[in-house]
Structure formats: C-alpha cells, structure tokens
C-alpha cells in the first residue's frame, strides 16, 4: 500500500473542499441576481458532492458574459461551464507575437465545437515585445494585463455583466468579485479545478487538446535571454497550489529548458 499517495490524495481532497466552501462564502456576500446566485450555489454543492458533471444546470434568464478565450485547456473549460449559466460571447486577443495563424484556426475550431460565438480583438504588444527582446522583463505579467484590459473593454462595450477568465490560482475573494460595474469571474479557481479535471471535462465534451507550454512570445523571451527562472517559478507556483501535478510540472520545466 502506497501510504504517501493515499496521504497526498486526502490532502488534495481536503484542500479542494476548503476552496469550494470558501467560494460558497464569497458567493453569499455578493449582490447578484438571485437566480444566478442559486444556480452557482447549486453547481458548487454538486462539485462538493463529487459530481463529475456539476456544471450541467438550467437557468431561465442567463446574464451576459464575455469569456477570455485562447482555445487552450483553461479557457475552453471555462467556456464549456460558463455556457450552462451565462449568455456567452468568447473573445480572443490577437497579436502576431502571441498567436500564430494555426493557433487562431484552432481557437475557431474549439469555439465551434463548444457552440459559442468567437470574436478576435487585436491588441498592441509592440512595447512588450521590445522589452522582451532587450531583456528588460519577463513577458507574461505585462502581456496578461494588456489582454485583461482588452477583454474588459470589450465587455463594457457590449454591456456584459461578467468577464470570465481561466485562472486556476485566483483563490478566495479573487475568484469572483466586482470591479467597477463588471463582475470578474475566475471560473476554474472558483470551482477549485485542477488541470487534469479540466482535461476530463473537455474529453467528456468531445475535446482533446495537446499543446506545448507557453506562447510564441514566451519562447522568444527564452531564446533571447536564456533565462528560465521566472517561467519555472510560475510553473512551481501551480504545482504548490496543487492545480498541476508534480509530473506535469516537471514535464513543463524540461520542455522550456529545451526551447532554443
């Protein structure tokens, strides 16, 4: 009997329960539509009870929401779950530095499989690119902020009440909160999902994704700077947060170290 594995599983389960109960507490304090609150509460309770399809729920009046969509594991899972609860519009932020033509087509195909409309919004990453090739900074934080702002601006333009991001690590009050007139919803962290659980949801909806770690801009950073410290720290943060297992974390680290 592998006692270490048993203990690890029990710790992971307890941590998941604590995070889900925390999401319930956050939900109760929010001033949102009663029907929506009850729907989200129901999905959280189903998740606490271990139901695989916890997100399958019917709601009469769906609030308008924008999903930040790349076609990756996190955003695709977020879109599948959000579609059950919200009137969803997916937005993909496009720049030649972070999205190839192949990635763009892949995002279109995944959105079609999920059954959501997708719009591409062009973003300006020239200054971020210059900083990356000149070795001034790691791209992820600045790039993520540009994308966030573009998605939120789009949501305001179409009068959406919610903006949904695929953040796995935004625990506690960061999972769902109001920012000015829009609710920001980090959906995977709200439901305490792991990367493996996300893949299972995708598979159950006929989607299997095999993707390399990082976007083209991150690979440019590694090529020009030969510095992997900050990327490895980001990977280890996901492992410590128990949203990615140790094997996948190790695989991702090896992959970036081999990027030339």
Curated annotation (Swiss-Prot):
Signal peptide: none annotated. It comes from Methanocaldococcus jannaschii (strain ATCC 43067 / DSM 2661 / JAL-1 / JCM 10045 / NBRC 100440) (Methanococcus jannaschii). It comes from the Archaea. The lineage of its organism: Archaea, Methanobacteriati, Methanobacteriota, Methanomada group, Methanococci. InterPro entries: ATPase_PP-loop_MJ1638 (IPR012096), DUF7411 (IPR055834), Ni-pincer_cofactor_biosynth (IPR052188), Rossmann-like_a/b/a_fold (IPR014729). Gene3D superfamilies: HUPs (3.40.50.620). This is Uncharacterized protein MJ1638.
